[in-house]
Amino acid sequence: MEHTASLPGYVREKLAELDLELSEGDITQKGYEKKRAKLLQPFLKKPEGDKVKSTPPPPYYNVKNANNSTNHGNINNDGVIVSSEGYSYVTEVPSLSSSQQRHSKKIDFHQQAAMSLSSAPQSGNAGAPGYENMRPQGGAVGDPGYQNTREPSAFQNQQSTNNSQHRQRRTQRKVTHNEKRYHSEVRQEAVQQALAALKGRPKPSLPMPSKRTSVLNRSPGCNDELDSSTDDESIPEETISPDKEYNYPRDHISNSILPPEPIIKPPIRESSMGSQQHARTDVKQNQITNQKYTAPNSAPERRPPQNLPPLPTSEPLSSDYPPIAYKRENDFSDKAFKQKQYNAPDITQFNNAHRAADRVTRYVNVSQNELNETDANGKWKVSAKIQQLLNTLKRPKRRPLPEFYEDNDIELEIAANTKDPNAPKPEGSTMTPVQGEQLSIPAGLPRTLECALQRYGTNSFKSPMATVLDPNGKVTTTLTYGKLLSRAQKIAHALSTKIFSKGPEQVTLKPGDRVALVYPNNDPLSFITAWYGCMFRGLVPLPIELPLSSSDTPPQQVGFLLSSCGITVALTSEACLKGLPKSTTTGEIAKLKGWPRLQWFVTEHLPKPPKEFNVGNLRADDSAAAYIEYTTDKEGSVMGVTVTRAAMINHCRALTMACHYTEGETIVCVLDFKREVGLWHSVLTSVLNGMHVIFIPYALMKLRPSSWMQLITKHRASCCLVKSRDLHWGLLATKDHKDISLSSLRMLLVADGANPWSLSSCDQFLSVFQAKGLRSDAICPCASSSEVFTVSLRRPGRGSCGFSPSATGRGVLSMAALSHGVVRVDSEDSLTSLTLQDCGQVMPAAQMVVVRSEGPPVLCKTDQVGEICVTSGSTSASYFGLDGMTNSTFKVQPLLEELEQPKDGNGTVNIISKPIGEDFYVRSGLLGFLGPGGLVFVCGSRDGLMTVTGRKHNADDIIATVLAVEPMRFIYRGRIAVFSIKVLRDERVCVIAEQRPDCSEEESFQWMSRVLQAVDSIHQVGIYCLALVPPNHLPKTPLGGIHLCEARRRFLEGSLHPANVLMCPHTCVTNLPKPRELHQGVQTAAKLSSSSGCGITDTGVGPASVMVGNLVQGNRLAEAHGRDVGLAEDCERKPQLITGVLRWRANTSPDHIIFTLLNSKGAIAKTLTCSELHKRAEKIAALLQERGRIEPGDHVALIFPPGLDLLCAFYGCLYLGAIPITIRPPHPQNLNTTLPTVRMIVDVSKSGIVLSIQPIIKLLKSREAATSIDPKTWPPILDIDDNPKRKYAGIATVSFDSSAYLDFSVSTCGRLSGVNITHRSLSSLCASLKLACELYPSRHVALCLDPYCGLGFVMWTLIGVYSGHHSILIAPYEVEANPSLWLSTLSQHRVRDTFCSYGVIELCTKALSNSIPSLKQRNIDLRCVRTCVVVAEERPRVQLTQQFCKLFQALGLNTRCVSTSFGCRVNPAICVQGASSAESAQVYVDMRALRNNRVALVERGAPNSLCVIESGKLLPGVKVIIANPETKGHCGDSHLGEIWVQAPHNANGYFTIYGDETDYNDHFNAKLVTGATSELYARTGYLGFLRRTECSQSASLLDETTPSVASRDSDTESLNSISQLQLNFSNVSLGGNSEHSLVGGASNANDQELHDAVYVVGAVDEVISLRGMNYHPIDIENSVMRCHKKIAECAVFTWTNLLVVVVELDGNESEALDLVPLVTNTVLEDHQLIVGVVVVVDPGVVPINSRGEKQRMHLRDGFLADQLDPIYVAYNM
């Protein structure tokens, strides 16, 4: 063992932290040894010769100068010109080169599903061993264990051959029609190396997602228009964002590196100026340091690696691919130089940096208010009343209301945005604003656009203004300036005279009114004429996209914009009007969803205006709005950007100067002419300069990608407006290249030059077409946004600008540094580099700054990435109608941070921020930095930025990596969307792509696995969700690109319909709350406890200590009583045995109708009087005695449907003294499942005979039943309709303590248990119910529930006979046939009291939600209902109950009357809402506290709040306490524990328990270990708490404005705390009975005001324990049910420590995979749990018992036995 005394202090600190983590079980032994070795490695003996040299980061750009290179400096040895400014200028034209071939290794997968899944990390702190070994070895930014270095021999070998082969390779390049050439070759090589580095490492075995055969057979391509078969035949569509459209990967990522070796010795800083060998080492070390700075030192802050899901083991997968030659760019110098303005940061020395503690308390306990204590001696020297007053005054006040709504999950936010202390910091000087050249307006340029059109329309009326091509490439129409002027005047005149009807009003359009322009993308001529018609009239046009259908979602957002702008008139063409969606009834234009009602005005075939009409009379103010352009933000919201007339004309002038436009020039436009660059150049600036524009529709570009180049050749065009997509498409059309000449082209404007991947498109296009006359200075990338217009533009010709005209720049940047917002140069052969080109210079008359993208707009440093802001006279003015967003975007004053020295020299130094000037800047939404000479570098956009775990990633970078993964043609080229979603306080990366139609499931899984590895290795970020959709399933923009916002919306909504989904929450989610640690006391107690407890408290503190603590603090002990059972008036005349009661009623009131059975139509099927029941019971007793040879005490199985036969058979058994067992008959359609349960109950109950009716007897002996149960093995079966030969002699005499019947039931955990109910318990229960519910013979009670067990059996069979009331029986299956049967019965018979089940409530709510009007027409009135009790053995379903009340409130239902009962196996009726009981009280508890077995009361609507409703009122004679299920100690008031019950009608014990070998003897004879230790209780097996609360609530459950109970009563104790305290002490000291306690007893003086409410939380056996916390399945299931409308039912359970969620899909199988991400997101967000498996099944698969409870364990068994026939099973990684 090493001696650690000589180690530095911080190392010893970290070793101590590791020892603590190991002792607490946070990490494994293997992880401990690995981290410990890593800490001690720098201090072990080091081999010599391994010193690694370090260099400061060199400057971040290389600028090339083709014309005046010798004026800037001297040429160094590498041919790079070193300038006096420290920048390097490359003197040769960039070119492409190939690199070494790489080979892949074979990947083996092993399917060990349960083992690997169980090892998936549930904690955010450390990964399990199965996942720990998946860390990528190359380029592991953020992981200190995997530093990125090169093997020295490989490094030198490559560098020595690089220069000699460079020019030879460049000359050997061929331009062929090989599509691979235009993929991201350098990125592809980086991906291949990253994957190769991972292939030899062990993989966790994870099963591949499984699909049902029908889903597999379904073709992924569902659309008829399958227009993307190949990339050559059908060109991939445009972009991902409607604003910033893109289509293919950037080819700008530099070369990869060889497999790394670990760093042995800490690097030492040295100067970077030295020999060439030193320079090579510097490049290498720079790469190392750029990857080391983000490395944290311990597991909690390290993101677990992205893991590879294995494939099924049917056959091993081979990934040996043929070698592919890769090409890489070699445009950059191998050397980089220090920048003079600042010293480079020492980012290699981070070992001495002390880190904050790894353990962050991620959960803040919500403490209860506690009483202040007084002196122990003084407490007994004053009277009780005075002491009570003193304690009341000293009691802490309730928490302030705002505190209930504070965000208590801030720890999750902190964990999601960890600050890496070793991250690079910007170290440059603060930037200064960069000024564009002075705007010089050419002589003779028209003053306004209207003047320009009038001039050219008059003087050059035959000159062509616009030409459009048809889909065949032929010129169809040419619009001259004369025609444009005359048509615009016609439109202006028509708009000034047209009267539009707006409701009853007649309105005309006035100057300044806003109108919509709706024109298709192939009709620019009509659009231009309408545009200038609006300009002449002074109207404000808003161009919008053509709505494709009335249900399209993007037009909904546009409709909101139209409404906010007050637009009522839309201009369109006749052809467009015919294509608009029509109403099916009237044939008129349909009302589009979300749109205002528009008046459509056709701008064609208008009359000629009169001669006196003069469009020049309108003199609009320059500050007035000229037009509105829509833009979309990251979330998909559409906003209108208002452009003033001054800004419009100033921008046109600036473009005229920057682009050198002159009159008569010809421009070819491939862009969208309705917005942004296409609008500014082809519609506005072209008219200002009198130019000719040729428009190429998108449909033609898809068919003939080279058509724009052919038009340039044919018309000798001088300018062309394209996107990098069009360059790429033109390169693919090699067969058309021979006739192309681009010598006339002086400007090729690349509109999306701000996309970093445009660099490769420009370089490749230039290299191919330079031989066709294309000049290198003609390619002009530009950056733009709707808010700023043109941000920057590279000038054409580069010769006549004001300053540094010839400079163009590009540089290789570290993506890892960019993720921290810092610019650092990376080596060319780095896996994680990004190559950028400049987007030109600042526009004329504009001034530009870069400010921080987050927080206040502080000026950035020169080496810091921020948001580009511009001030000029040519920017937008505002977002229409959005003042708040306008101020934050269009009125930005950049701040300059300065240090304020204290006046006395001794104080602290403060940082103050001052505005740099009076000017307001406009945010462009582009992220970048400024280079020398005003060069603008853009590396992303604000909308495309994803901040994951504190680091920023560009969606474009992720796309480039994904598209470089083999096989290259797996997904369609431009059909990919990358975005982030906010889940659990952090952004998660989602990748959606369209797959090829012919790929198999296994191929998809392989490709997705490689993508996960590649993105994790290169970007150091995990993909949260990777989904593949069928071809043409991603939403498109009007120009065919990906509509990113709509794709994101559909993904979150669950309407994207993917074909394959892979979720990786285990590796991506690192900010889960810290697992709860169970201390040794809890673990020991859990082992010793005989019951299946849930670890309620830390038993290191004994139960006696807990009780004394409660007493000392004055807290009540949780104990409650029902009222005493009084003597009824006719008690002396009525015997107490139920058989005697029936015989007595038959004698005293023989004709009294006691039971009425209704059929499905509501008609009376049968009635039963007291005498009829008595006689039939005697007959059946005689039958059993005669034919069945039944003796008193024998067991008889009764298998009957709900009805009167069951009643008669039950009393027949009691008459004979036999013990009946009621059993639900098997379902005819589901015999295989239900018949074995029936037979099991018959066998377990030891029934000697079966009594039933003829249809069920035939079913038991049928051929279908014989496949499950042999008919010959049944006990003797008797038909109840058989007639005995002689009458029964007399009723058997039985004792009160003998068994009356056995109550069998299957629990939700799959346990079959039968309890013994004695005659004494039966009579006591009936007496208690009669007293609570005020039942007597004249009452009518409607029952709609299952009569086989629990309180349902008691209400159906016993209480009617005991109380003599009229019971109206409705079988639940009759309600399924007629959902309104139950409610109509209540109304028809004026029933005041009714009992039902949750199944009936749910059926009525779902089936009758749309039938309220028809029910009103049938005069159904529910005002008569006084109590509606839902019989249940679970926590009350608050949401379902509230929905039922709210729905039928329209029929007069009083919402207060609906309540829930509570019973269990040990006592069928503990709580029932009585006839005169107050309304059930509700409280809101904190779900997070509940997970930790605590009750913390909060307010309605508070974060993590859960509404819990009181389960009825305690029945008379019932006493309830709350005890700790582990320690059996008495809990305090409002503390969570197990509900124990003491009542005369408790069951007498279990007859038998089948399916569980646990000892349950103490369930009926439990004793407390503290307090009244001699009393016996029955353990219910349910967790809950007691709370003293008010007896009535003034508001119903639905009243959202009334405070909850928590706001109106004490948080800690009752009003009688002191007297209760004394009484408790006396009870403890005497060890006696505390039945006479004032706590909730009938003797309490405040009994009319206060009562003890029983709140049931859930069954102990159902508690799911994950991460040390306890979850109740119903809470998780409620969250899942809310996440998607197609989820019909849901159930959760655990499997190998993984959470499994089973959801029933009520929809098409194609929608199954929509549920997987939503279920995962919802459970993660609401419960901080990671779902391990999502199973999508058909409706009806989740088993539900007769009480409406889910049989989760049966479902689990079916899942493990593969019996569910799932539609889809997703295994989350």
From Swiss-Prot:
Tissue: Expressed in the developing nervous system. Ubiquitously expressed in the developing brain. Within the mushroom body, a higher level is detected in the core of lobes and peduncle in the late third instar larva. Detected in whole mushroom body neuron structures at 48 hours after puparium formation and during later stages.
Bias-annotated ranges (Acidic residues): 224-236
Compartments in which it is found: Cell membrane
Biological processes annotated in GO: acetyl-CoA biosynthetic process; axon guidance
PANTHER family: DISCO-INTERACTING PROTEIN 2 (PTHR22754:SF32), DISCO-INTERACTING PROTEIN 2 DIP2 -RELATED (PTHR22754)
Coiled coil: none
Domain DMAP1-binding residue range list: 3-110
Physiological role: Required for precise axonal bifurcation in mushroom body neurons by suppressing ectopic bifurcation and regulating the guidance of sister axons. May function by regulating expression of tdp1. Acts downstream of the serine/threonine-protein kinase Bsk to modulate the direction of axon projection. May play a role in fatty acid metabolism.
Listed Polar residues bias regions: 113-125, 146-165, 272-297
PROSITE patterns documented for this protein: DMAP1_BIND (PS51912)
UniProt name for this protein: Disco-interacting protein 2
Quaternary context: Interacts with Disco.
Xref: InterPro entries: AMP-bd_C (IPR025110), AMP-bd_C_sf (IPR045851), AMP-dep_synth/lig_dom (IPR000873), ANL_N_sf (IPR042099), Dip2-like_dom (IPR037337), DMAP1-bd (IPR010506)
Molecular function, one GO term: acetate-CoA ligase activity
Superkingdom to which the source organism belongs: Eukaryota
Gene: DIP2
A matching Pfam family: DMAP_binding
CDD domains in the cross-refs: Dip2
